[in-house]
Every structure is written in structure tokens, then in C-alpha cells.
Curated annotation (Swiss-Prot):
Catalytic activity: 2 pyruvate + H(+) = (2S)-2-acetolactate + CO2
InterPro entries: Acetolactate_synth_lsu (IPR012846), AHAS_TPP (IPR039368), DHS-like_NAD/FAD-binding_dom (IPR029035), THDP-binding (IPR029061), Thiamin_PyroP_enz_cen_dom (IPR012000), Thiamin_PyroP_enz_TPP-bd_dom (IPR012001), TPP_enz (IPR045229), TPP_enzyme_TPP-bd (IPR011766)
Cofactor note as given: Binds 1 Mg(2+) ion per subunit.
NCBIfam families: acolac_lg, PRK07418.1
Span list, region Thiamine pyrophosphate binding: 408-487
Name this polypeptide is given: Acetolactate synthase
CDD domains cross-referenced by the UniProt entry: TPP_AHAS (cd02015), TPP_PYR_POX_like (cd07035)
Pfam families: TPP_enzyme_C (PF02775), TPP_enzyme_M (PF00205), TPP_enzyme_N (PF02776)
Residues at which Mg(2+) binds: D458, N485
Family under the similarity heading: Belongs to the TPP enzyme family.
Length: 579
């Protein structure tokens, strides 16, 4: 008791908030000030003066949420964003939904009108607590200032444990100003009643899974974003090598396994609507699938049970709601992916001995598949193809962190860009145009000495191009590659394929700024590129430039992204394959 009494300090709620963030290792916050969150900003000022926390002023609150998202994905830590009440808070919504669908640990802190004004339709009052309930793991409205330290600890625990995701704390202005007796609450010391995610898989189900692995002749490890979030890269590699099981991934699972590894389904053996043909064909011939941290969503698995329709399926996921939701499962295992795979590996000796060494695995057949159905990179005589743009970028900068926006350029990047764990950031669930640039800001803040490249399109880039101001203000050295084809490219492709070339509201040739000139207005370096040879010469200079760099690459205008599985079709029914 004596120690506790000595630890008590009389402080404001805002001080307790910022000190609690600091105790969780928070060094960077992305945000935008307003009337309701000024008490918090006053404490951020003190923390910045002390060199404890750095705040980055974004140009739109959506950018703050995406920057916190990119920070979190690339580090495995909680990313923090901050907004004021009303429109500031609602501007976070798309960013929080993006993080929620991709299971990203983001802490959003919003200002709110004083408690006495709640429910009165006060200026800039909005029920952000209620608005965000479907798109966060948990929302808090802080009514008692003394509860702030506990709520922060609880929020970090919720964001990081189980299936990661965003958490929102809504703080009325008078709560931030209120004086409280502050006793710090140590990180990890608080657990939410009734919240106990299952981390260890059921031993009986793990044994059943190993039994099926030992009997399979055509197995496959199918890996998604859940494996990235769990940090299960080493366990996946060991399981694959120990049982000689080929590995493929979803768009969200890129980087989980060395794409040059003999057991990888190629560069890039990605499944789904725009996955590689050999990966999509191979999955239809399997007799066994180990699905790790995946959702079997429609862009990968089509109509669910059509996916690997002859195969038995083990589905491993931390979220019991995902197991068996879209594809029936023979052995469901609920638990932390890394823990479950680790437990499986500990038990494998017995099953390795049972594994018949003369049973062929499907690696040889897959090697044969790759040769007749490779990904192609067009080399137009006059210009540059978007595929060539992505391939050349990956070839010249293999160790970079990559963010993407959403559209054709995202799918081509998924096909051609190679990278390691936590070096690939894209909006795979919500499909948020405008994600890439602010996400790259967050990644670069977290990794100041690494190359961070945003791959965007001319449509997506205009969604959040105001964040060039943030980049300019803080000298954040991201490299932006805009694959500019003058279209909303993916929508145009669908209009071409399914709507008889009725191109309504997809032409961007008129009204789109010259991005290099726009960058110049912000005081940033930029280049225009229209020819492949010039691109090959200028790209190394752009990537090695110490500060920010924007490269406007005018690519061929009417290129379609193939292969493509039409909605509602199984993975073997692909469009755009040559006979």
C-alpha cells in the first residue's frame, strides 16, 4: 500500500492517456487536432518536447487510420491514430473498416463533446461509439476519467490478442481535462472479463490432422494473412519441408514463404481471381489442403465448396467464426496459428515414420504446370506495360517494403512483386482505394532506414493524394510508383468483359492532374516516364533518392489483368489463358 501511495500523482485524464500509451511503447501517433481533442494534443506537445512521442499531422483523418494500419502491419505492433469529434471521427471509419477486415491492430482515439453535452446534438457531436461497433473489436466511451489507464491497457490487449483488430476509445473533452489520482496500470496486467481467445489447438484434432497429412498424396499448404499476423513464417517453412508439402498463398498471405523455394508454387504462386493459372489448376487436383489463417473468401475460393472440391481440408484459425464458414472442413482447429503449427511439429516424428517415402508428392507435377502457363510480361514497342512496371520494380528492389492501392495495379503487384514477411501491405478485405500512400507513410515512419514503395494507379492515388503534404512536411522518404493508364482500370476491365464495352464513368484522361507537377507544387522530386528503357534507367535513381520521390509511369492504356476467374466460377475456369 505504501508503494501505491507513493506512486499516486494528481494529473489530467489526457496526461494519463499519453503516459499509458508511452508505457505501451508507443513512439508515433498519426492524427489531426480539433476542439474536442485539444486536451490530448496539449499533452502530446509535452511528450514531444520531452522526446517521448512523435506526432505526424496528416491531411485527412482517413490518412491517419491508414498510416497507423501500415505501421501496425509492418511492425506487428499496435498503430495509433487520433481524431477529433464529429467529422474528424467519421473520417476514420473507412480506415478502421480496412483494418478490421484485414485483422490489423489499430488503436483509434477520438475526442468527444463534454459529458454534459452528450445526447444534445451539440456542435460536432456524433455517436462514433455506435457507428464503429460493426468494424472494430471493441469500442469504449470513457465516462469516468479514472478509468482511462485501465481502458488503455485493455484496449491494447484486445487489439493484439486473439484475432487482431482495431479498437476505438472515445474520450469526452472534459474527461481529458479532469484531474485524477493517477496510478499507472502496467501493460498486460488487465484482462477483459469473458474474453479468452483459444490459443492452443485441441490435441486430438492435431493428431487427426497429422494422420491425414501422412496419408495424403497431393497435399497443399494454403496460407493467408492470419499466418502473417501470427508470425508463423518459420513454422510454415518447417512443416512444408518436413513433409515436402507445396505452399501457396492468398493475396494477404504474400511473404509468408520464400517464393523462390522449390516447394513454393512459383513466383508468385498466388491463388484466386487473379492468381497464377498453375496454382488455380493445381488446387483443383488436390486430395488434401492445410488451410492456415485464411477465410476462404469469394475472391480466392469462389463459391466455397467448389474450391478443392475433392480434397479433405484442415482449417487452422484463431477465430472460430471463420472455421468452416465458407468451406466445409474435415478437421477444424481453433487456435493461434503459430502455436498450433508448433504443436504439430513437436508431434511429427511418429507421423514422419509412417509417411510412405514412395508416395509421390505433387511438386514434380507443379513444376511441369508452371512451364506451359507462366505469367507473361508484355513488352510493347512504344511504351511500357503495367506488368513490366511491377516486374522491373521487384527485380531492382527485392528487399523493399511495398504498399499498394486497389485495382489492376494491385493484382499485377501481387503476381510479380516478391517480398518477405510483413513487407507487403495491401487492402485485401475491404479493397480500399487510397490506402497505399498513407499506409506507406506509416511503414516508412516505422522503418526509416528501409526502402518503402507505394504502388498505385491514377484512380487510387487521387483518393488520398493530399498526404503528399504530410510527406513533404516531415520529409518522409517514400517512393511512389503510379501506374497511370487513364482509367479506373479494374472497373473498365469488368465493363469490357461483362458489359459489352459500355465504359461509363471510368475514363480518367480528362481532369486528372499531371502528378509530377503536383509533386513539384508540394516541393517533392518527381519524374515522368513513358518508355520502358527510360523507366529502366530512371527507376534506380528514383529508388536511391534519399527523400520522397514520385514516379508517374504512363503505361499501356487497355491492358487487362489475367488470368481472371469470373465471379461464381471455380478456380479452374479462368479467362485470358492462351490455348
Amino acid at each position: 500500500m505504501q508503494d501505491q501511495k507513493q506512486a499516486v500523482k494528481r494529473v489530467t485524464g489526457a496526461f494519463a492517456l499519453i503516459d499509458s500509451l508511452r508505457r505501451h511503447g508507443v513512439q508515433h501517433i498519426f492524427g489531426y487536432p480539433g476542439g474536442s481533442n485539444l486536451p490530448i494534443y496539449d499533452e502530446i506537445y509535452r511528450a514531444e518536447q520531452a522526446g517521448e512521442i512523435k506526432h505526424y499531422l496528416v491531411r485527412h483523418e482517413q490518412g491517419a487510420a491508414h498510416a497507423a494500419d501500415g505501421y501496425a502491419r509492418s511492425t506487428g505492433k499496435v498503430g495509433v491514430c487520433l481524431a477529433t469529434s464529429g467529422p474528424g471521427a467519421t473520417n476514420l471509419v473507412t480506415g478502421l473498416a480496412t483494418a478490421y477486415l484485414d485483422s490489423v491492430p489499430v488503436l483509434a482515439i477520438t475526442g468527444q463533446v463534454p459529458r454534459s453535452a452528450l445526447g444534445t446534438d451539440a456542435f460536432q457531436e456524433i455517436d462514433i461509439f455506435g457507428i464503429t461497433l460493426p468494424i472494430v473489436k471493441h469500442s469504449y466511451l470513457v465516462r469516468e476519467p479514472s478509468e482511462l489507464p485501465r481502458i488503455v491497457v485493455e484496449a491494447f490487449h484486445l487489439a493484439m490478442s486473439g484475432r487482431p483488430g482495431p479498437v476505438l476509445i472515445d474520450i469526452p473533452k472534459d474527461v481529458g481535462n479532469a484531474q485524477i489520482d493517477y496510478i499507472p496500470v502496467e501493460p498486460g496486467s488487465v484482462r477483459r472479463v469473458g474474453y479468452r481467445p483459444t490459443e492452443r489447438g485441441n490435441p486430438r484434432q492435431i493428431n487427426q490432422a497429422l494422420q491425414l497429412i501422412s496419408e495424403a498424396t497431393k497435399p497443399l499448404l494454403y496460407v493467408g494473412g492470419g499466418a502473417i499476423m501470427a508470425g508463423a513464417h518459420a513454422e510454415i517453412a518447417e512443416l512444408s519441408e518436413r513433409f515436402q508439402i507445396p505452399v501457396t498463398s492468398t493475396l494477404m498471405g504474400k511473404g509468408r514463404f520464400d517464393e523462390n523455394h522449390p516447394l513454393s508454387l512459383g513466383i508468385v504462386g498466388m491463388l484466386g481471381m487473379h492468381g497464377t493459372a498453375y496454382a488455380n489448376f493445381a488446387v483443383m487436383e488436390l486430395d488434401f489442403v492445410i488451410a492456415v489463417g485464411v477465410r476462404f473468401d469469394d475472391r480466392v475460393a469462389g463459391t466455397g465448396d467448389q474450391f478443392a472440391h475433392s480434397a479433405k481440408v484442415i482449417h487452422i484459425d484463431i477465430d472460430p467464426a471463420e472455421v468452416g464458414k465458407n468451406r466445409s472442413t474435415d478437421v477444424p482447429i481453433v487456435g493461434d496459428v503459430r502455436q498450433v503449427l508448433g504443436d504439430m511439429l513437436q508431434r511429427t516424428y511418429h507421423w514422419e515414420r509412417k509417411l510412405s517415402r514412395n508416395k509421390p508428392r505433387n511438386g514434380t507435377d507443379l513444376n511441369q504446370l508452371r512451364e506451359p502457363i507462366p505469367l507473361t510480361v508484355p513488352h510493347p514497342e512504344d511504351g511500357i506495360s503495367p506488368q513490366d512496371g511491377d516486374w522491373e520494380l521487384s527485380h531492382q528492389c527485392p528487399d523493399a517494403f511495398y504498399t499498394t492501392d486497389v485495382g489492376q495495379h494491385q493484382m499485377w503487384a501481387g503476381q510479380f512483386v516478391q517480398n518477405g514477411p510483413r513487407r507487403w501491405m495491401t487492402s485485401g478485405g475491404l479493397g480500399t482505394m487510397g490506402y497505399g500512400l498513407p499506409a506507406a507513410v506509416g511503414v516508412k515512419v516505422a522503418h526509416p532506414h528501409d526502402t518503402v514503395t507505394c504502388i498505385s494507379g491514377d484512380g487510387s492515388f487521387q483518393m488520398n493524394m493530399q498526404e503528399l503534404g504530410t510527406i513533404a512536411q516531415y520529409g518522409i522518404g517514400v517512393k511512389v510508383i503510379i501506374l497511370n493508364n487513364g482509367w479506373l482500370g479494374m472497373v473498365r476491365q469488368w465493363q469490357h468483359m461483362f458489359y459489352n464495352d459500355r465504359y461509363e464513368a471510368t475514363n480518367l484522361e480528362d481532369g486528372t492532374p499531371e502528378f509530377a507537377r503536383l509533386a513539384d507544387v508540394y516541393g517533392l522530386e518527381a519524374m515522368n516516364v513513358r518508355q520502358r528503357k527510360i523507366y529502366q534507367r530512371r527507376l534506380p535513381k528514383a529508388l536511391s533518392h534519399k527523400g520522397p520521390m514520385i514516379l508517374d509511369v504512363r503505361v499501356t492504356r487497355d491492358e487487362d489483368c489475367y488470368p481472371m476467374v469470373a465471379p461464381g466460377h471455380d478456380n479452374s475456369d479462368m479467362m485470358g489463358l492462351s490455348s
